Swiss-Prot record:
An MF annotation (GO) of this entry: DNA binding
Organism per entry: Shigella sonnei (strain Ss046)
Biological processes, Gene Ontology terms: regulation of DNA-templated transcription
Gene3D superfamilies according to UniProt: 1.10.10.200, 3.30.70.980
SUPFAM superfamilies: YebC-like
HAMAP family to which the protein is assigned, alphabetical: Transcrip_reg_TACO1, Transcrip_reg_TACO1_YeeN
Superkingdom per UniProt: Bacteria
Family: Belongs to the TACO1 family. YeeN subfamily.
Stated name of the protein: Probable transcriptional regulatory protein YeeN
InterPro entries cross-referenced by the UniProt entry: Integrase-like_N, TACO1_YebC-like_2nd/3rd_dom, TACO1_YebC_N, Transcrip_reg_TACO1-like, Transcrip_reg_TACO1-like_dom3, Transcrip_reg_TACO1_YeeN, YebC-like
Lineage: Bacteria, Pseudomonadati, Pseudomonadota, Gammaproteobacteria, Enterobacterales
PANTHER family, per the entry: TRANSLATIONAL ACTIVATOR OF CYTOCHROME C OXIDASE 1
């Protein structure tokens, strides 16, 4: 099910290590989560989850603390979530999820990126119906059957458990992601490389080298935009 998560984690780590942009994006997400509830992660499940993901991405503690302190201090910025869908070359599809304090700016920027990078922005729902929402948990391991038993005993709604290059990859129903993480922690598994709500393509395409270069430029440009938090696509060889 889905793309090779071991490769995705490796690429993400390499890219994140080369830029501080990921820190800024997590800072915004942490601030927004803290503003929507209590600025204490022990009292705010959403905030706690974002902080855990930030730590997986090796976001420094001072960045996390600064975002929480800003929320405690009564920062007046309001952030709105958004989703933009579109198409690349030869059946490739892409979804960009955003978190922004200026929706008009974000719409203009995303539309410009699609136009300049060989894509076409689509209407809401034009792409997302070809993706499934899922919780994804990835950690080092080699016994998917044992992990499945742990999750089954905890009554976690699991779609699939696989082993990829020394990593256990778990797909859960979106509503059971946190339950799955809790069950694994109770079983002594505490180090995760990914704990995310993701959109998984129902089917994938492989692009030619020429089309892949265009599509990769589109993905990179979207990921580099300050307001874009996540990018999903259906290209198997990226």
């Amino acid at each position: 099910m889905g793309r090779k998560w071991a490769n995705i984690v490796a690429k993400k780590t390499a890219k994140d290590g080369a830029t501080s942009k990921i820190y800024a994006k997590f800072g915004v997400e942490i601030y927004a989560a803290a503003k929507q509830g209590e600025p204490d992660p022990e009292l705010n499940t959403s905030l706690k989850f974002v902080i855990e993901r930030a730590k997986q991405a090796q976001v420094p503690k001072h960045v996390i603390d600064k975002a929480i302190d800003k929320a405690k201090g009564g920062g007046d910025e309001t952030f709105v979530q958004g989703r933009y869908e579109g198409f690349g070359p030869n059946g490739s599809m892409i979804i960009a999820e955003t978190l922004t304090s200026n929706v008009n700016r974000t719409i203009a920027n995303v539309r410009t990126i699609f136009n300049k990078k060989g894509g076409n922005i689509g209407a809401a729902g034009s792409v997302s119906y070809m993706f499934d929402n899922a919780g994804v948990i990835v950690f080092k391991g080699s016994d998917p059957d044992h992990i499945f038993e742990i999750l089954l005993e905890a009554e976690v709604d699991v779609r699939d458990v696989t082993e990829e290059e020394g990593n256990i990859v778990i797909y859960t129903e979106p509503t059971d992601l946190h339950k799955g993480i809790a069950a694994l922690k109770a079983a002594g598994i505490t180090e995760f490389s990914t704990t995310e709500l993701e959109m998984i393509a129902q089917s994938e395409v492989e692009l030619s080298p020429e089309d892949l270069e265009i599509f990769e430029g589109l993905v990179d440009a979207l990921e580099d935009d300050d307001d874009v938090q996540k990018v999903y696509h259906n290209v198997a060889n990226l």
